[in-house]
């Protein structure tokens, strides 16, 4: 292991907010920072295991500082109108939390570029950052999440606040919790997260906002189709056929999440897309 794991905390809104910082042994003078927001009921450490430590390995080989924030009561206050969680009840400001973490990281390390990945609820948090913290990110990656539909799309800022940002999306067509084709997201009717757009609709909306052209479609693996919208701010959608609510990381996960793929590892694609 050629990195140090730091457990950090800060005070915000009367809450002690915690986050993990993976600091590689070899750091450039202005290292990039990659925030990775966990899914519902997870934590930073759970996400590290969930991804088979592949993003810790990314930190090691690229000199990127990887940060795993912890949500309040294991959730982030994302951009959906429907979010029946404690973090929404308390009005937690996870945009401010992200800004404060980044300020502290800049003070300590002198940061170059800033990126964010998010899975499920964490992916929704990244979508919120794109609109409610425009220009904060140099790139975003969203796993198993799509824009809310209609009134379920509820960031604080209007969509017009968005600033063009390269975005990578990965979504399984057999996702049981965040339907690839859109519809009602959530475990069941009692735990719904409201109506959401499809993955292709979400990618197309981001591409339009980015002024990117396409898509050009390519089958990159037997079970993976990549669609690319190109321009100064590109968008890629990786459609994972028959795959569930997962982050491809070469490991076996809870069968209730659906099938995983062994065709590729997400961390490798993120590294290439962000140019880490």
Regions found by a protein language model. Give the residues of each.
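A domain-start/cap signature at the N-terminus of enzymes
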Residues: 1-33, 46-53, 58-65, 90, ...
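Active-site glycine-rich loops that stabilize anionic/oxyanionic intermediates
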Residues: 31, 39-43, 243
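Structural cue for short, hydrophobic secondary-structure segments
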Residues: 36-39, 68, 239
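Serine-hydrolase catalytic-loop signature spanning alpha/beta hydrolases and amidase-signature enzymes
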Residues: 41-46, 74
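Cap/lid segment of the alpha/beta-hydrolase catalytic domain
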Residues: 70-93
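Alpha/beta-hydrolase active-site loop
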Residues: 86-108, 128
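Short beta-strand/loop motif that positions the catalytic acidic residue
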Residues: 169-171, 175
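Acidic catalytic loop of the alpha/beta-hydrolase fold
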Residues: 175-178, 245-247
